[in-house]
């Protein structure tokens, strides 16, 4: 019973996340956090432009609340909106901007290189942008753009790298955009930290008793 409830809650959160992605495009929607409370369900929405989530006179947030109640059967939803501190370190925001630029006709290489520079300028330890699909011809291909340090496999890649997948609808077809970012605050298992300061030589003597 507990397992079924857990699965149902995760499915519900995934569906709500997909709904927000489509509804809050202009707001620069990133992700949500859902938490059950004694008085209902608190949903924290993280977005680049919180004002668009709230809407004029609270119209948008009311629409979201009504949909959560009626369609997704969320008990007494309380929506809280929080701004992103550094949008260029959020893979969902970066990926969305790349997809939007591609849909406007910008060249994929110029768009990707520009995004890489912004992410690294924001302080990331590393970034990888992968664009796949029909980019300039009939044949599909994959282009990768990377800078800095990046873990691609194993436990560090799962725990230290945040990623997002976005889609761009072009005339030639659907193009996938994957963004992976290693944030500046992560500590790598094999990272060596050198502390600055004066190095003092210490010599110790010990007496050896002779019997």
From Swiss-Prot:
Keywords: Ribonucleoprotein, Ribosomal protein, RNA-binding, rRNA-binding. It comes from the Archaea. One of its GO terms (molecular function) is rRNA binding. Residues 16-85 form the KH type-2 domain. The keyword Ribosomal protein applies. It holds the Pfam family KH_2. SMART domains: KH (SM00322). CDD domains: KH-II_30S_S3_arch. GO terms for biological process: translation. One of its GO terms (cellular component) is cytosolic small ribosomal subunit. Part of the 30S ribosomal subunit. Binds the lower part of the 30S subunit head. Belongs to the universal ribosomal protein uS3 family. NCBIfam families: PRK04191.1, uS3_euk_arch. This is Small ribosomal subunit protein uS3. It comes from Methanococcus vannielii (strain ATCC 35089 / DSM 1224 / JCM 13029 / OCM 148 / SB). The gene is rps3.
